[in-house]
């Protein structure tokens, strides 16, 4: 009988956005498949991989600190992810890092791991990786990455320089992955990319194949196909192209969740032009009105930037007026901060930090009031809730209007006889500006 040798252990740190999380999951899946053991602590690991974020300066700092901690605690560190595209910046602070790769360099990361910590003799009967792969999210929801890169050149963003132009994954491959996830117990799929609504543009929406059937490579066709899986499908990072109108009827028909994450960034035409973003606010308001007429249950999430270079009080007031009229359900707001390599750094009339802070506070105060009013309208109604956590006090879940991590929650006090992934009908009894409380029907 051959002696079972201990599995080499890899520590893993994943920073940044959901798109980075998908990259991490893909690397983890490969490592586990090859027989490596993924461990939660540095001191047990033969090596540590840090998947970094480099989108804004605070994320760069967090990534550099995580690399430093891994070096201090372990000593053997491979760096990958967005900040990896700036190797010199990392080497300047942490010259002892073993290897550095850029984003979505899965094969390179694995090659480096093999070099420093050779592959074990793997017995698939002893260490079975779940078919859907190793997920860093709870088992009942998963992110589905449909493309990489972006064709836009927004002046505040450096994603294209890090991740390149849009490259859509083959639709058959995407749908096969979705099917594997559902077969493994996933109840909710979150569709992500740098620009979800541009899916297929780079391949001229060519026809692919899934289960022998022709399927067009487009966001609408993808949604149609995902709707056949009988799960919650949630769309994120949807750039406001005209064809976004085509997915609203699918939401009204219950085929995908009535939820749209559509980053608008500002409402002043002048600032939008400086950002190189679409600039017709009146048209956007008209579309929102039309979407809600077609799908009254629609939840709209967006993100905005205050304090962008050149933003005047008049520009900011346009943004507040837009919020009052659009009455969006979920809103995130960022104070503009310069990002190394972004075109916006060269713009004149940078806004003082204290003005950014003051505008951010006014923005959030207004939006909290709007969000509270929107949620108050749900009191007394029945909604569907997917359970995320259960403890001795009760259950915490999310409605169709709530994406994990970034939106609110639904609290079911005393509801302990459920498990994560269960979908319940709940009567809403109370609301604040972010969350709901209710009881199972």
From Swiss-Prot:
Its EC number is 2.8.4.4. It is found in: Cytoplasm. Residues 376-441 form the TRAM domain. It is an enzyme of class 2 (transferase). One of its GO terms (biological process) is tRNA modification. Its cofactor is [4Fe-4S] cluster. Residues 136-373 form the Radical SAM core domain. GO terms for cellular component: cytosol. It holds the Pfam family Radical_SAM. [4Fe-4S] cluster 1 binds at residues 17, 53, 82. The keyword DNA-binding does not apply. Residues 8-118 form the MTTase N-terminal domain. Coiled coil: none annotated. It catalyses: L-aspartate(89)-[ribosomal protein uS12]-hydrogen + (sulfur carrier)-SH + AH2 + 2 S-adenosyl-L-methionine = 3-methylsulfanyl-L-aspartate(89)-[ribosomal protein uS12]-hydrogen + (sulfur carrier)-H + 5'-deoxyadenosine + L-methionine + A + S-adenosyl-L-homocysteine + 2 H(+). Binds 2 [4Fe-4S] clusters. One cluster is coordinated with 3 cysteines and an exchangeable S-adenosyl-L-methionine. Keywords: 4Fe-4S, Cytoplasm, Iron, Iron-sulfur, Metal-binding, S-adenosyl-L-methionine, Transferase. [4Fe-4S] cluster 2 binds at residues 150, 154, 157. GO terms for molecular function: 4 iron, 4 sulfur cluster binding; aspartic acid methylthiotransferase activity; metal ion binding; protein methylthiotransferase activity. Belongs to the methylthiotransferase family. RimO subfamily. Catalyzes the methylthiolation of an aspartic acid residue of ribosomal protein uS12. This is Ribosomal protein uS12 methylthiotransferase RimO. It comes from Shigella flexneri. The lineage of its organism: Bacteria, Pseudomonadati, Pseudomonadota, Gammaproteobacteria, Enterobacterales.
């Amino acid at each position: 009988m051959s002696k079972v040798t201990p599995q080499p252990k890899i520590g893993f740190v994943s920073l940044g956005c959901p798109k980075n999380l998908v990259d991490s999951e893909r690397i983890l899946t490969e490592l586990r498949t090859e027989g490596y053991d993924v461990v939660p602590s540095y001191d047990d690991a033969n090596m540590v991989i840090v998947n970094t974020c480099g989108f804004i300066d605070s994320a760069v700092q967090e990534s550099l600190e995580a690399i430093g901690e891994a070096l201090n605690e372990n000593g053997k560190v491979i760096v990958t992810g967005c900040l990896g595209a700036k190797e010199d910046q990392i080497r300047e602070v942490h010259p002892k890092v073993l290897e550095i790769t850029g984003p979505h360099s899965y094969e390179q990361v694995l090659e480096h791991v093999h070099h420093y910590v050779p592959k074990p003799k793997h017995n698939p009967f002893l260490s079975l990786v779940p078919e859907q792969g190793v997920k860093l999210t709870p088992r009942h929801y998963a992110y589905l990455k449909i493309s990489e890169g972006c064709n836009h050149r927004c002046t505040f963003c450096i994603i294209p320089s890090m991740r390149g132009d849009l490259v859509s994954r083959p639709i058959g491959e995407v749908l096969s992955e979705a099917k594997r996830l559902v077969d493994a117990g996933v109840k909710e799929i979150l569709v992500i990319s740098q620009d979800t609504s541009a899916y297929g543009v780079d391949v001229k929406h060519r026809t692919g194949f899934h289960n022998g059937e022709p399927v067009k490579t487009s966001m609408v066709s993808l949604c149609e196909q995902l709707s056949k899986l009988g799960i919650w499908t949630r769309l994120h990072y949807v750039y406001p192209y005209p064809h976004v109108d085509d997915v609203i009827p699918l939401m009204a028909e219950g085929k995908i969740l009535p939820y749209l994450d559509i980053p608008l960034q500002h409402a002043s035409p002048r600032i939008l032009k400086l950002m190189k973003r679409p600039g017709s606010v009146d048209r956007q308001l008209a579309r929102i009105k039309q979407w809600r007429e077609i799908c009254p249950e629609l939840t709209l999430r967006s993100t905005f930037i205050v304090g962008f270079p050149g933003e005047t009080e008049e520009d900011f007031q346009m943004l507040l007026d837009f919020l009052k009229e659009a009455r969006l359900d979920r809103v995130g707001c960022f104070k503009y901060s310069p990002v190394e390599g972004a075109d916006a750094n060269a713009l004149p009339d940078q806004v003082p930090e204290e003005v950014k802070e003051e505008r951010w506070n006014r923005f959030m105060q207004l939006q909290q009031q709007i969000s509270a009013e929107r949620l108050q309208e749900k009191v007394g109604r029945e909604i569907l809730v997917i359970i995320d956590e259960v403890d001795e006090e009760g259950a915490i879940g999310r409605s169709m209007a709530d994406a994990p991590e970034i939106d609110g929650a639904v609290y079911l006090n005393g509801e302990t006889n459920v498990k994560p992934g269960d979908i319940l009908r709940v009567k809403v009894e109370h609301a604040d500006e972010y969350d709901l409380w209710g009881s199972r029907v």
